[in-house]
């Protein structure tokens, strides 16, 4: 599927201005360029174009609210100055798996003042001597490079994977507290009924046990009285024999 058709599909009857997250992974770009994406997507905060055969991002529209951009597994080798102009508020950028060979290609990213996380996995530039040290010097605003900070401490998942989560699910979350999704309609009160029935069974069981214990006690008393009666009878018989 080409990129234009994929964008149309992802809109799902929404207007471009309403879209905050757009995932175009694995579709086909035309001649290695972005197409179908316009500045009408003014509310876009997260854009993913992984493995779409991009070789240029020159056609990227003005996206002032864009915070995270996924460009991994493409054929990009330069032209990154466009990002500072079109996406000035970018905080997360993933360029892993592209044809970036030297630090000079990355230098235009200095103008991205809010850039916090940059990924360059599987790019030739990572093979340079003192790559990490030099890149942190080149981009002092960076907190994380390839998932680790300057002290080689791993980024929290929220930064390593990106901060955007459930941007288009706000409406779905509104009623979550009002009902239990795992309970089918009409069965919400069944658990309470089962508990009440269980309590009633326990009470009746206890009453039966008390009745059994009472009957056993009465039987024991009867046995004792019978024994005493027999003893008294024997005593009387013995007395009669003595009188004779």
Curated annotation (Swiss-Prot):
Coiled-coil features, chain-numbered ranges: none
Give me the segments passing through the membrane. Answer: none
Entry-linked Pfam families: LRR_9
BP GO annotations:
nucleocytoplasmic transport; regulation of apoptotic process
| Phosphoprotein listed as a keyword | yes
Q: Determine the domain of life of the protein's source.
A: Eukaryota
Where is composition skewed (Acidic residues) in this entry? 157-227
Q: Where is this region: Disordered?
A: 148-244
Could you tell me where this protein is found in the cell? Nucleus; Cytoplasm; Endoplasmic reticulum
All copies of domain LRRCT, residue ranges: 123-161
Q: Name one GO molecular function term.
A: histone binding
Mind telling me how this protein is modified after translation? Answer: Phosphorylated on serine residues.
Gene Ontology CC annotations of this record = cytoplasm; endoplasmic reticulum; nucleus; perinuclear region of cytoplasm
Q: Which Gene3D superfamilies match?
A: Ribonuclease Inhibitor (3.80.10.10)
InterPro entries linked? AN32 (IPR045081), Leu-rich_rpt (IPR001611), LRR_dom_sf (IPR032675)
Q: In its keyword annotation, does this UniProt entry include DNA repair?
A: no
Intervals holding LRR repeats: 18-41, 43-64, 65-87, 89-110
Keywords, sorted A to Z: Cytoplasm, Endoplasmic reticulum, Leucine-rich repeat, Nucleus, Phosphoprotein, Repeat
Q: What does this protein do?
A: Implicated in a number of cellular processes, including proliferation, differentiation, caspase-dependent and caspase-independent apoptosis, suppression of transformation (tumor suppressor), inhibition of protein phosphatase 2A, regulation of mRNA trafficking and stability, and inhibition of acetyltransferases as part of the INHAT (inhibitor of histone acetyltransferases) complex.
Q: What PANTHER family does this protein's entry cite?
A: ACIDIC LEUCINE-RICH NUCLEAR PHOSPHOPROTEIN 32, ACIDIC LEUCINE-RICH NUCLEAR PHOSPHOPROTEIN 32 FAMILY MEMBER A
Q: Which family does it belong to?
A: Belongs to the ANP32 family.
Under what name is this protein listed?
Answer: Acidic leucine-rich nuclear phosphoprotein 32 family member A
């Amino acid at each position: 599927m080409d990129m234009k058709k994929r964008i149309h599909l992802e809109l799902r009857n929404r207007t471009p201005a309403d879209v905050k997250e757009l995932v175009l992974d694995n579709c086909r770009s035309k001649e290695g360029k972005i197409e179908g994406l316009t500045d009408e997507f003014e509310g876009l905060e997260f854009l993913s174009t992984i493995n779409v055969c991009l070789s240029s991002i020159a056609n990227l529209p003005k996206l002032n609210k864009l915070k995270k951009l996924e460009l991994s597994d493409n054929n990009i080798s330069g032209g990154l100055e466009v990002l500072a102009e079109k996406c000035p508020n970018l905080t997360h950028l993933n360029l892993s798996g592209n044809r970036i060979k030297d630090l000079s290609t990355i230098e235009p990213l200095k103008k991205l003042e809010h850039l916090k996380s940059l990924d360059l996995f599987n790019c030739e530039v990572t093979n340079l001597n003192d790559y990490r040290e030099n890149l942190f010097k080149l981009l002092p605003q960076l907190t994380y490079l390839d998932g680790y900070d300057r002290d080689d401490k791993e980024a929290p998942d929220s930064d390593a994977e990106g901060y955007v989560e459930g941007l288009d699910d706000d409406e779905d979350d509104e009623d979550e507290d009002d009902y239990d999704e795992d309970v089918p309609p009409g069965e919400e009160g069944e658990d309470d009924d089962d508990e009440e029935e269980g309590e009633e069974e326990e009470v009746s069981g206890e009453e039966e046990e008390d009745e059994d214990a009472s009957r056993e006690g009465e039987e024991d008393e009867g046995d004792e009285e019978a024994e005493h009666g027999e003893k008294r009878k024997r005593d009387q018989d013995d007395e009669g024999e003595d009188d004779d």
